[in-house]
Amino acid sequence: MFRIPLVAALALVLAMPAAFADGQDVDKVNGSITAEAGQAYGNLQTVNGGIHVEANARTGNVGTVNGGIHVADGAQVGGLETVNGGVRIGRQVRIGKGVDTVNGEIFVDAGGHVGGDVGTVNGGIGLVDTDVDGGISTVSGDVTVGVGSHVRGGLKVEKPNSNWSIHFGKPRIQRIVIGPNAVVEGPLVFEREVKLYVHASARTGTITGATAIRFDGAHAPQD
């Protein structure tokens, strides 16, 4: 997924037509941005600051370089991108495009819909009862495709790029969980060592680079 620098990708995404926007853009260099509950906005962009989209707000693309993104329940947004920060998404949120970060975690709560890919470099990914039209990718993060989630693309754990992968000692083995009644339609490709847990009720595409460990309970075994 990360074929061009994310800062450049962020600029590209914010230049695209906004998926849900019918209001004014908000563009800052320093400072946080809040999209107020129930209101409509265009694209939201800042360099140094977090972005908060309150419940049932509608926005275009949302992007920051240094800051986290929080989207509250029932909101509708375009693409979500940050470089240094996590992305936390509430319940019943519709995301028109993808969700990406370099250094930070991504979590999508129940009833979410992501219209594109979900990707991190250094950070975990967690989905609960969420539909993803694209795929999932990470380099060093854990991934949980939680109960009832449906990923129409694949799942890929990429080999670290030598430009940003400096390790001392043995690297941590990542944990990948495909939970109860979850579906990953596309291939699961692992370019580095992982522990892959797949629930007995889950369905996946072909698996390359790892051996699935089956589990039957509500939660995967602890390592």
PLM regions: where:
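Intrinsically disordered, low-complexity terminal regions
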Residues: M1-D223
